[in-house]
Amino acid sequence: MSRRLILTLVLVTMLVKTMAGMESKWVETTDEIKKRSGTPEKERESGRLLGVVKRYIVCVRNPCPGRRAISEQT
């Protein structure tokens, strides 16, 4: 009976350690991704907005296919 109890405790301990190791590894991976990006959410958002504005400016200067330039419309 004591052998079964010891075996059960060893297996449960191994399972708990494995689960804890997997959980800590997942948290580290998420943190690493945030560290790698290195830019806060606001900077990324402003970068996206600048990209949209730049495309619009290019489209106004050189008309997009199927559109005329604003200077030609007036």
UniProtKB/Swiss-Prot annotation:
Expression by tissue: Expressed by the venom gland.
Entry GO CC: extracellular region; membrane; other organism cell membrane
Positions of post-translational Proline amide modification: P65
Pro-peptide region(s): 22-33, 69-74
GO biological process, one term: defense response to fungus
Task performed by this protein: Possesses antimicrobial activity against both Gram-negative and Gram-positive bacteria, as well as against the fungus C.tropicalis. Also possesses a relatively high hemolytic activity. May act by disrupting the integrity of the bacterial cell membrane.
Family per record: Belongs to the non-disulfide-bridged peptide (NDBP) superfamily. Medium-length antimicrobial peptide (group 3) family.
Name of the protein this chain belongs to: Antimicrobial peptide HsAp3
Species annotation: Heterometrus spinifer (Asia giant forest scorpion)
